[in-house]
A protein has these predicted regions:
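A short glycine-rich, Lys/Arg-flanked "PGG" loop and its adjoining helix->strand segment in the class I
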Residues: 120-132
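Core SAM-dependent methyltransferase catalytic element
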Residues: 181-212
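Conserved class I S-adenosyl-L-methionine
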Residues: 1-35, 48-52, 80, 137-162
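Class I SAM-dependent methyltransferase SAM/SAH-binding core
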Residues: 40-96
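A conserved beta-strand element that flanks and buttresses the S-adenosyl-L-methionine
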Residues: 108
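A short His-aromatic
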Residues: 111-115
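Short alpha-helix
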Residues: 166-184
Length: 212
């Protein structure tokens, strides 16, 4: 049976594939040359963001998703990439991450935030599992304008509603600013440029008691 996860994997493999290494590079640039540590890729789907991060760094990467079918595909992709020693899958919802406080140096998430039911709870969870000095890079995008144009053109050929759906999902910088103000994250950046729309924050201090 063709599941949603299989369909997304096919699109990622055949159309999106050049965007992932570019996005991984942009994410790792936020870590300013630190190429070791642990990374949680939330809403990983078939895992191409996390796998690209693993290829471009020495990080241990957890591909985390609440769709078991997506994780089965992710496992195959990990094996094909020969990255079983550094990349693994874990099932769960972003709103309740099954890891202790301060477990990850980097939390990434591309193309998933739009689907989260309780985004405030989810972002607070991400902040909780980030190590001190850790970075979160959450949102959506296609790497750069040229890649976005290529994806739009190919997606429009198979779905004439692609641009409408993509615009509806994307939201805007103001929505993200307002969302973040409701969370325990006090310092963050919302960047909207050719790379997409992303929330970036670094964990530099614990939230105060009132913020818990
Ligand atoms: C459009 S796919 C993006 C996959 C991948 N990040 C990429 O960019 O290729 C969105 C993924 O987010 C996952 N997802 C949605 N809501 C989630 C949640 N609350 N917790 C964990 N994963 C979630 C879905 O199961 C799906 O695999």
């Amino acid at each position: 049976m063709q599941t949603k996860a299989t369909e997304f994997d096919q699109i990622s493999k055949n159309i999106f594939y050049p965007i992932y290494p570019v996005i991984a590079q942009q994410i790792l640039a936020e870590r300013k040359g630190i190429s070791e540590g642990t990374c949680l890729d939330v809403g990983s789907g078939p895992g191409y963001v996390g796998l690209s991060i693993a290829r471009q760094s020495k990080m241990q990467v957890c591909l985390y998703d609440m769709d078991q079918n997506a994780l089965e595909i992710a496992k195959k992709n990990i094996n094909e990439a020969l990255l079983e020693d550094r990349v693994f899958v874990k099932y769960g919802n972003v709103e309740e991450i099954p890891y202790p406080n301060e477990s990850f140096d980097l939390v990434t998430s591309r193309g998933s935030l739009f689907f989260w039911q309780d985004k405030v709870k989810a972002i607070n969870e991400i902040f909780r599992v980030l190590k001190m000095g850790g970075t979160a890079y959450l949102g959506g995008g296609f790497g750069n304008q040229k890649l976005k144009d290529m994806v739009d053109q190919k997606m429009l050929a198979i779905d004439d509603q692609w641009l409408v759906k993509a615009a509806m999902r994307k939201g805007c910088a103001d929505d993200y600013e307002n969302l973040l103000k409701k969370t325990i994250v006090k310092q963050f950046t919302v960047k909207e440029d050719d790379s997409g729309l992303w929330i970036v924050f670094h964990k530099t201090s614990e939230p105060t008691k009132e913020q818990h």
